[in-house]
Every structure is written in C-alpha cells, then in structure tokens.
Amino acid sequence: MVGTTSGSTPAGGQTDRVQSNPSPTDRSRPVPPQLLPRTAEADGDGTLLIGGCNVLDLAEEFGTPLFVYDEAHLRERCREAMAAFDGRVAYASKAFLCRAMARLVHEEGMTIDVATGGEYRVARAAEVPAASLVMHGNNKSGAELELAMRDGVGRIVVDSFDELDRLEALVADGAPAPAVLIRINPGIEVHTLDEVATGVPDSKFGFPLADGDAAGALARAAASPAMELMGIHVHIGSQVFSAENFADALAMLGPIVGEWDLPEFVVGGGLGVPYVTGEEAPTITQWANGIHRACDEAGIRATVSAEPGRSIAAAAAITLYRVGTIKEIAGVRTYVAVDGGMSDNPRPVLYGSGYETFLPRAVAAERPRTVTLVGKHCESGDKLVVDGAVPADLAVGDVIATPVTGAYGHSMGSNYNKVLRPPVVFVADGQARLVVRRETMDDLLATDVG
C-alpha cells in the first residue's frame, strides 16, 4: 500500500510559515505516502490507484484538471472525529462542499457548519435537515438569517451586536427564536499566517474578550426573548499545528465559560495537516485529546464539540493536470505549465503554500529533477509548486498530480481568465462517480446578460 492513515506524530516546534517546500536532501525521494489518500497504492506497472481506480484512466475519462477524492479516506476521518469528540462534530463545509460531500458527512452523523446562504442551500439541496446545520458568518444578511430561522436551523453562531439586532428584529416580525452560540475572540497569537489567524486581537471575527464585548454579548443574548443562548464558540485560526495554541485559548476562556455555565462549548476547527515532505501534524484523535485535557485544566464543564474541515478533506484528494509545455531557462529554472492553476488552487498565490508534485504513472519513482509547476493564467505568480521534484523523464503530455488538495482548492476556485472550473469525482471500491461536472462554455455565459 502507498497510502497510510492521516497525520503523523505531533510536531515539536513550529514556524510562522504554514507550509514550506522540502529541503534539497528530500527532493529526489518519492512522494511521501502519508501525503496520499488512504487507499492509494501502486499497481503492477507502478501506476497510482485510488479507491481501486487507475488515476490515468480517470484523467482520460473525465479530463484534466480533475479533483479525485478517496471516499474511504473521507469516511475514515469523519469517524475518527466523531469518536474523538463523542459524536459532537460539525464539518466545516468551507473546506469543500458539494451535495455529495454534504450527504457523506451527514451519513457519518456529523452536523454541518455553513457560513453563507450558498453553503446553506447546497446542504439543504443534499436533504440535510436544517436542524443539522450550524449557521456561521461575520456578516449574515437578514435574508440569510430569516431563511435559516424559518427552516429551524440547529444553531446560529452570533458574531456581532448588529447581528443581535437583526435576530431580534426578525423574531419581532414573526420568525421563530433561534438557539444561538456567542463567538468570542480570545485575542491570542497563534503559529499560522496572518490571513488565517482568526483569534488574534485584530480580527474581524467574534466578540473581543479583553474589552468586555464578549461579556456584554452574552448578557444581552441571555436576557433577550428573541433567542435561546446555548453556549460559547471560539476559533483561533486555520492550519494550526501547535496544541499549546489551543490550550492557551481555552485557558483564557475558562473563567467566562465557567461564570456563565452554559451547556455547550465549541472549540471550532483549525487543525493543521502536512502538505510537504518533513511536515508533521497531530492526528484528529491527538488533537481532541489535547482539547479535552485543556478544557479539564481550564475548568470547562460544558459539553465540548469541534468543527474540523481541512483535517477531514485535505489529504483525501489529489488534483490531476496535464503537462502542456516545458520551458527550460538556462541557469534560472525549468517551468512546467499545466492546464489548471490558480483558478483551481489559489492557496500558493494567497498564502505562499507549499505542495509536492509527482507523476501518477510512476508514483514510487525517484524525483531528481527540479521544476516549478505553473498554471495557464496571465499572472507571473500563478505557481502551483515552486522548486518541486519530478522524475527525470517528465514529458509534455504527462498527467501530473499535486496531493493534499481536498480542502480550499475547489471551494476557493474561480473563473479567472474565464477558465472553466474542473470536475470532482469520488472513488471507492473500483468505481468512480462524478459528483461535480466540469463547467461548460454555456455555464460561463449563463449569467452574462449584457
């Protein structure tokens, strides 16, 4: 087997970078098995199989770019999370959402965290009950709130005093009173990028703890007949590897959680995952054990739940591309251009995120050649993998892959340069099913009414 279970041992130290490319000593080695989906293996010819499906055959059948998700991997991560938090888990759908994904996590017993009316409608279109949804967002519109309230949404996570005003106005107009959580910003620094740190003092999310806004929001919600205050919510950031960061936040929140003695306490998500050679992260189980221990130490007696997203979906998928050009610039670098790019994975452009790359036709091959994998967009920064490693015989026409693209790739995709967004397939037991089709030119023009 090429694949392994998700995660490795917890990292000892952390850097401010979320990801980094592998060191020169590691670059020539085969792609690390722990970065591949759970069921990944090589067939007799050395070609990558996922879910029993030959990925080169998938590229021929569905075209490239193509997201390939290992359904067994997704379900295994869901089950690990549910066991670690005693069945109290909401999947953070911003990581990756389509109707098939919503159905899958619902089948595994999870509720679903949605942050916009669009995410809400996709989950409902998958026949997920409104009571199994948690409505997030720092700027929910009146229309979004009203739809969720009239449907009977499970929880609304309140993010501002303006939102409290909206809830009270909607209930006064006849909407049913919702059950709410108050999102508190603990104001701590975490080891991640500024763009994904959500619990720092300077953040658009939540009620600040330090200035008394959090206490004021709790008091107002508790006194309001327009809502039922169920608990407190916190989220410190994304791609966080350090268990100490979570423990620090829980220690800061212990007094206010204890003072209010509410039944629910949600720790959010944010657990980091490895993207490149040499990175390590806690497993979901290890993370949960640390959360429970920190809650005990902070005197938090409420029922604890979590909202993982990246740790469920990221390593479950790879993206397949086809090589279109290879441009060697003597003394500078070799550019390998593919038929996708920043429109299907904007994370390298947004965050400087590192990724690996490999050839599925030779998944266990050494990778002695250094290249920079770039997309087809009109941006010099459209780089998917900088100084990546590939086999020496890479050629135009090859199918090339990047692993760990199951979270914040498809969900953050765009039509930049009017590129069509790629399809998504789920694979299991030797069968591939199309769950998101490739966009067409008709789709591209459908909203262009000028």
Regions found by a protein language model. Give the residues of each.
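A charged N-terminal "starter" segment
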Residues: 1-179, 223-229, 430-450
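Charged (often Lys/Glu-rich) extended helix/loop segments that serve as interaction or gating elements
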Residues: 3, 301-450
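General structural feature for long, well-ordered alpha-helical segments within catalytic domains
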Residues: 54, 58, 70-73, 77, ...
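Structural signal for hydrophobic packing residues in well-ordered secondary-structure cores
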Residues: 62, 78, 82-85, 109, ...
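Active-site beta-loop-alpha junctions enriched in small/polar residues
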Residues: 73, 94-98, 115-119, 138-140, ...
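Short acidic, glycine/serine/threonine-rich loops at helix termini
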Residues: 102, 125, 145-150, 167-170, ...
